[in-house]
Swiss-Prot record:
Pfam families: GcpE. Belongs to the IspG family. Its EC number is 1.17.7.1. The lineage of its organism: Bacteria, Bacillati, Cyanobacteriota, Cyanophyceae, Synechococcales. It comes from Prochlorococcus marinus subsp. pastoris (strain CCMP1986 / NIES-2087 / MED4). Binds 1 [4Fe-4S] cluster. Converts 2C-methyl-D-erythritol 2,4-cyclodiphosphate (ME-2,4cPP) into 1-hydroxy-2-methyl-2-(E)-butenyl 4-diphosphate. Pathway: Isoprenoid biosynthesis; isopentenyl diphosphate biosynthesis via DXP pathway; isopentenyl diphosphate from 1-deoxy-D-xylulose 5-phosphate: step 5/6. This is 4-hydroxy-3-methylbut-2-en-1-yl diphosphate synthase (ferredoxin). It is an enzyme of class 1 (oxidoreductase). GO terms for molecular function: 4 iron, 4 sulfur cluster binding; 4-hydroxy-3-methylbut-2-en-1-yl diphosphate synthase activity (ferredoxin); iron ion binding.
Length: 405
């Protein structure tokens, strides 16, 4: 077999694999949370409160912590806000909440970033807003000299922050947004994934020059196709140039309700399935704590993390022998705390036993008024329908897998 044929076979084997092979990335510590391909994909969010409101900011972080959020971001638009973050951090420590904090800094926020770096575990900057570039409607080109001049300005302003982050072993997110590319990136590359990639790479290379590698990169857009293209492009570019930095995935401004969740899943889930992504945020126009179950559901659906019971149930049809929706609800209410189990509830024997073969336990209609309970592929017993849920619980208890809620 030739080298080319071997590569094609390997590519096909990955394409048809039932296991997601993650892109190899370095480990970046954000507080005590390790981000990178050697660790689970992490879940994070951002609070809505004004950071100056220390008490309510603390409570918002506490709510996120309680639902499993691993990293929390705060907006820091001024020096006063930066100092308030210190008070928030102190209150978290006093209450034994160790969730790492990320400061979101924009618009020439060098002094702000320097101040807040003392109090947080990671600073997020937006390359498009780091150095103000005044729009010139008469411009016909950006010369190499102009690019180099602006790069030197960025280097001068950026270096002190990098040195602080290095000295305190803290992290940086280079957070590119499709909607806020710099004037010269827009002029040169357009409002495109390529413009986003060039924007990110400019800062990646500056960090490399400064020997700073605690970097995470994001390429967010409000349209999933743009976001998908940008993340694929930056991953290819990083790998081609020998950089193995982790990626933070997200569809920004995804909206709310079902559509916001579906839109986020279309973007984030697609990239995760391709092996890209080391930490994720689902951005909803809702209370931040509502984002966290969506994140964990995406990860569990792809087999990347298991943090809840996996329920397998058919959509129901004319062959269904009991009220499937009602029974699924009863089983879920009784067993949702048994993290790690797979439980299948199937309406009839046509597809039931085969479809649920990988489940730990099965609940299948076997005739009018009769339920069959399974342990993996083995039928254990048949019981009257009205005793089915209780009998399932007894079976789980008999196997020593029950935990009181």
């Amino acid at each position: 077999m030739s080298l080319t044929q071997s590569k094609e076979v390997n590519s096909l084997s990955r394409r048809y694999s039932t296991y997601i092979e993650r892109r190899i990335t370095r480990t970046v510590m954000v507080g005590d949370i390790a981000i990178g391909s050697d660790y689970p994909v992490r879940v994070q969010s951002m609070i809505n409160e004004d950071t100056m409101d220390v008490d309510n900011s603390y409570l918002a972080i506490k709510r996120l912590h309680e639902v499993g959020c691993e990293i929390v971001r705060l907006t820091v638009p001024s020096l006063a806000h930066a100092k308030a973050v210190g008070d928030i951090k102190e209150k978290l420590i006093k209450n034994n909440i160790d969730t790492p904090l990320v400061a979101d800094v924009h618009h020439n926020g060098m002094k702000i970033a320097m101040e807040v770096a003392k109090h947080v575990d990671k600073v997020r900057i937006n390359p498009g807003l780091f150095v103000f570039e005044k729009s010139d409607p008469t411009r016909t080109e950006y010369t190499d000299t102009e690019f180099e001049t602006i790069k030197k300005t960025i280097l001068k302003r950026f270096t002190p922050l990098v040195e602080v982050l290095k000295s305190e072993n803290k992290a940086l997110r280079i957070g590119v947004n499709h909607g806020s590319l710099s004037e010269r990136m827009l002029f040169t590359y357009g409002d495109t994934p390529l413009g986003m990639t060039e924007s990110a790479m400019e800062f990646v290379k500056i960090c490399d020059e400064l020997d700073f590698h605690n970097i995470i990169i994001s390429m967010k857009a409000s349209r999933a196709p743009v976001m998908l293209a940008a993340y694929r492009m930056i991953a290819d570019r990083l790998d081609a140039e020998g950089y193995n930095y982790p990626l933070h995935l997200g569809v920004t401004e995804a909206g709310d309700g079902d559509y916001g969740r579906i839109k986020s899943t279309a973007g984030i889930g697609t990239l995760l399935a391709e092996g890209l992504g080391d930490t994720i945020r689902v951005s909803l126009t809702e209370a931040p704590e509502k984002e966290i179950p969506v994140c964990y559901s995406i990860l569990q659906s792809l087999g990347l993390r298991k943090t809840m019971v996996e329920y397998i149930s058919c959509p129901s049809c004319g062959r269904t022998l009991f009220n499937l929706e009602e029974v699924v609800d009863k089983v879920r209410k009784a067993t949702s705390h048994l993290t790690g189990l797979d439980i299948a509830i199937m309406g009839c024997i046509v597809n039931g036993p085969g479809e649920m073969a990988d489940a730990d336990y099965g609940y299948v209609g076997k005739g009018k008024g009769t339920i069959a309970l399974y342990r993996r592929k083995e039928e254990i017993k048949r019981v009257p329908e009205d005793e089915g849920v209780d009998a399932l619980i007894r079976l789980i208890k008999d196997d020593g897998k029950w935990i009181d809620p």
